[in-house]
Amino acid sequence: MACVLAIGSILFVWILGKGKYSGAQLIYRMATNFAISQGCCLVTCACELTEEIKHLHTRYNGHYWRALKASFNLSCAAFVTAILCYVFYEPKLMASLPLTIDITLTLLSWLFCWILGIQGPTPATISEITEIKQLNVAHGLAWSYYVGYLQFVLPALKESIQKFNEENHNLLKFPETCRLHILIPLSCRLYGDLKDVDENITFLKEIPPLYIDRAGIKGRVFKNNVYRILDEDGRPYNCIVEYATPLASLLKMTDIPSAAFSADDRLQQTKLFYRTLKDILENAHELQNTYRLIVYEDFPETKDHSRHLLSQEILKHIRQQHSEEYSML
């Protein structure tokens, strides 16, 4: 359809301008219109860059070059055209054209951009559209995790902890430990036992399971585990910890060629999963003080990376919650 419109526009300009304007004048005007339109796009991209810089660490890991590439999608053809217009400028080329021809030439320049793929949405714009319209993989995973799991488990957590404490001498006696601590590693690597990744974390016990009839399964079981975590001085802390299981899907997608899902895509989707889940839970006011999201980087770039990263991250959040509880008293 774009090619048909382009051919029609060329014929229209040729009919109206035949014998009145030279081909050089018409081409020069179309080139200047193209350069001006690309200049407007350049300003728009600069505005997008200022917005992306605000999210430099959450979206691009602090890399300015990645933010720059995501914000700009201009072809070198725009700059070459602008230079050629300047080099070959002559007053006679800037003829005063009728409004109909001028508008048609402007339309024609946009059509050529579209046909040749010179102008298109930037990666940042595409990301914004898919995020707003909830077209990302992460949105579906976050909502599925909430409506299919957290929406059942979190409201019942308080009662399950009470039963657990009655049977186990109040092992979870502090408010900051009576929450479900959800681990969100940016690498998406999940382990069956947390001790496999950090020897300062050991499985202690299960809290009483939750049974729900769901999706044709009678008495479907939802379990949560209590882990004992040792700090740097060997002092024990007990809390309920588990991974956000949908992250395993993101990791598997990277290994499936047909998914066309790169490691960078996985990282961006993991961050979006966290932001989406955070928004969902914050809007579920009845679930306040029943969970804690722990997002952390677990792909070390240096050899002196701590072997106790996970226990340190969990303890940091437990202490933060303790100070928050204390400040509210």
From Swiss-Prot:
GO terms for molecular function: 2',3'-cyclic GMP-AMP binding; cyclic-di-GMP binding; protein homodimerization activity; proton channel activity. Signal peptide: none annotated. This is Stimulator of interferon genes protein. It holds the Pfam family STING_LBD. Keywords: Autophagy, Cytoplasm, Cytoplasmic vesicle, Endoplasmic reticulum, Golgi apparatus, Immunity, Innate immunity, Ion channel, Ion transport, Membrane, Nucleotide-binding, Transmembrane, Transmembrane helix, Transport. Residues 26, 89-98 are lumenal. It is a multi-pass membrane protein. CDD domains: STING_C_metazoan-like. In absence of cGAMP, the transmembrane and cytoplasmic regions interact to form an integrated, domain-swapped dimeric assembly. In absence of cyclic nucleotide (c-di-GMP or cGAMP), the protein is autoinhibited by an intramolecular interaction between the cyclic dinucleotide-binding domain (CBD) and the C-terminal tail (CTT). Following cGAMP-binding, the cyclic dinucleotide-binding domain (CBD) is closed, leading to a 180 degrees rotation of the CBD domain relative to the transmembrane domain. Disulfide bonds: none annotated. The lineage of its organism: Eukaryota, Metazoa, Chordata, Craniata, Vertebrata. GO terms for biological process: activation of innate immune response; autophagosome assembly; cGAS/STING signaling pathway; defense response to virus; innate immune response; positive regulation of interferon-beta production; positive regulation of macroautophagy; positive regulation of type I interferon production. Homodimer; forms a homodimer in absence of cyclic nucleotide (c-di-GMP or cGAMP). Homotetramer; in presence of cyclic nucleotide (c-di-GMP or cGAMP), forms tetramers and higher-order oligomers through side-by-side packing. One of its GO terms (cellular component) is Golgi membrane. 3',3'-c-di-GMP binds at residues 144, 149, 220-223, 245. Belongs to the STING family. It is found in: Endoplasmic reticulum membrane; Cytoplasm, Perinuclear region; Endoplasmic reticulum-Golgi intermediate compartment membrane; Golgi apparatus membrane. It comes from the Eukaryota. The chain crosses the membrane at residues 5-25, 27-52, 75-88, 99-116. It catalyses: H(+)(in) = H(+)(out). Residues 135-325 are annotated as: Cyclic dinucleotide-binding domain (CBD). 2',3'-cGAMP binds at residues 144, 149, 220, 245. It comes from Xenopus tropicalis (Western clawed frog).
